[in-house]
Amino acid sequence: MNFEISSSFSPTGDHPEAIAALSEGIKSGVPFQTLLGVTGSGKTFTIANVIKEVQRPTLILSHNKTLAAQLYSEFKAFFPNNAVEYFVSYYDYYQPEAYLPSTDTYIEKDLAINEEIDKLRLRATASLLSGRKDVIVVSSVSCLYGMADPTAFAEKVTHLERGMRIDRDKLLRRFVDALYVNNKLEFKSGCFRVNGDTVDIFPAIETFDGMAYRIEFWDDEIDRISSFNPLTGEEYDEQDELNIYPTNLFVTTQERINMAIGQIDVDLGTQVNFLKEIGKPFEAKRLYERVTFDLEMIRELGHCSGIENYSRYFDGRAAGDRPFCLLDYFPKDFLLVVDESHVTIPQIRAMYGGDYARKKNLVEYGFRLPSAMDNRPLTFDEFESLTPLGIYVSATPADYELIKSEGVVVEQVIRPTGLLDPIIDVRPSLNQIDDLMEEITQRSAKDERVLVTTLTKRMAEELTTYMTRMGVRCNYIHSDVDTLERVQIMDDLRNGLFDVLIGVNLLREGLDLPEVSLVAILDADKEGFLRSHRSLTQTAGRAARNVNGKVIFYADKITASMQQTMDETNRRREKQMAYNEAHGITPKQVMKNSVSMLAEKQQTAEPYAYIEPEPSLVADPVVQYMNRTQLEKAIERTRKQMTEAAKKLDFIEAAQFRDELVKLEDLLKTKKD
C-alpha cells in the first residue's frame, strides 16, 4: 500500500519548493539534507509530503518521548490508512543499576514497565517485519538501545493459512515458544486456549483492534480462521491467513539459552581469576556469588533479574560487537528524519559515554561480567553507519548537520498564517529594568504575555521578587523547577493567571506560546552558550507566533552572535513581507487552545504572582501519621494513578505519581509492624 495523505491543508508558501527539493534530493541519491524551517512554518506537514513523494519506510527521531508522542499524533492524522507506529522507552520509571566507589554505595535497578507502550513497541517491529513499505515509526533515542536479533524474532513469527497442514500440538508448542500462555480462565492479550479441535489465540499486537482469533482444525488441516470479540464471543470476519507475532521483543530458544549458560560459566571463571590476580579477592567472591545465582535462575525459570547484561550470549554476538536495535528491523532503503536535530544529534553522541561510565564501575568492582558492557546503546559512529539517508529538521541546525548535508539546505521561512519573524530592538542595559517594566505594562493592557531571559537562576528569582513587589503578575522557571511544574506554569501563563515568565533558558523546543508578544533578553551581549546565535534565535522565535511579536536585546555592545541573529531575522522578514505583499496576505494571529498536558486538570486558583509550590502528598500531616496498612493502600492507589496516566501517554503526570510513590515507599520503610 502506498502512503496517502489525509489533510484539509494544501502546500502553501515555501511548502511546494521545500517538498520538491527534498523529494528530488532523495530520489537523485543525495544522502543527507537539512530542512531549515522557522517556528510555525509547518515543517511536519512538509516532511509528511516528502514521505508521500518518495514512498519509503521512515524513522522519525525525536529527542524526548513527549515530543515523540506529539509527532506520532500528527503523523497518525496525516496517514490514517498507513502504519504509523510509536517506539519509545517502555519505562514509566527507571533507576539504572550503579555503584559509587567513593561512598561504597550500590544502587539496585528499579523500574516500572508500561505494558501499553510495550505493545506499541511490539506493534512497530511487527509492522516493519511484515514486509509492507508504508511504515512510519516515530521514536525517541530508545530505538538505539539493544533489542533481539531481527532474524531470530522473525523465526518466531507463526504464519497460518486456511487449508495449511500442521499438527495441532506442534502449533501449540510454537505458541509457547513465542511466550504465549495457555489460559482458559483469563483469556487476555498474550494467551491462547484449546477446546478440542479449536484453538483461540489473543495476539499481543492485535490488542489495539480488540480482536482475538479462532483457528479450527479438521484433522491436521486448518479448516477455518476467524476473528472474534474476546469479551462477547461474537464472530467477525473469516481470514485467509494470519501472522502470530511473539509477545516479547527478546524472545529466544531453549537451545540458545543452554549455549548462553555454558558461555557465561566459562567467562565467569575467567573474570574471577582475573580479579584475584589483580588483588581483588572480595570483588571476585562477589562476582562469583551474583553470577552463579543468576545462572541458577536462568536454568530454572529461563530468566533472571538483570538478564539484559547477558544479552550478548543470547544474541550470539562476539565481545565488542554492537547490539541489534530497531534500525536493524528497517529495510536498507529507509529514510531517517531527525527532528530538532540541533538537540537530538548531541543527545545521540552522549548516550554511549554515559552508559559506559556507569557499567565500568559495575564490572571493575565485581557486580557484573564484562559482557554487561555490550548491553549498550549504539555509538555515534555505529548510528551513522546504519543511517545512510536522512533529513535533519531544525530552525537552527548545528555545524554537524550543515557539514553532513554538504550545503544542501532547504529553507522554509514563509508561514501559512502570514506571520513575520519578530522585530529585534537593541537597547542599552542602563535602566533596563525600568524600561522593561514599561514594556510589560503596555503588553499587559493588551492581554499579551512576556518572556524574560536572564543569565543565572539567582537573577531570575531576584527579578521575580522585585517585579512582584512592583505589582507585576509574574513567575519564574529554571532547571530546579521539575517537569510537571514547568508545564503547569506554561499553562498558567497562557491562561492569563500571570503575565510575565522569567527564566534562564526559555528556548525549549516544542514551547508553543502564541499569547507571547514580547521576548526580553537581558545581558544579550554576554557571549556564551545561553547567548550564542542558535540560543538567541531559538529564544527570539518564541515571539514568532504572535502578530505583534517583538524581541528586545538589552546590551551595551553588539556581539557577533547578536549581529548574526539580527541579520538572519531581517533577511527572513524581508522575504516574508515580499511574499505577503505579492499574494495579498494579511498576517493572522495564531489561535490555539491551551490543552494542558496534565490530563486537562481544572485550574481553579486565582490569578497570582510568584508563589511557593504546593507541598507534596507525603508532606501532608495526615499521611505522616498513617499506619502501615493505610500507607500500603495509599501506595497501591498512587501506583494505579501512575499506571492510568502512563496508559494515556501522559508521562508528565505519571512522573509526578512515580515520585510520590517513591516517597510513600520510603515512608513505609520507617513504619514498624
Feature-to-residue mapping (PLM):
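ASCE RecA-like P-loop NTPase motor cores
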Residues: 1-595, 599-602, 642
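Acidic, low-complexity intrinsically disordered tails
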Residues: 1-2, 442, 578, 582-656, ...
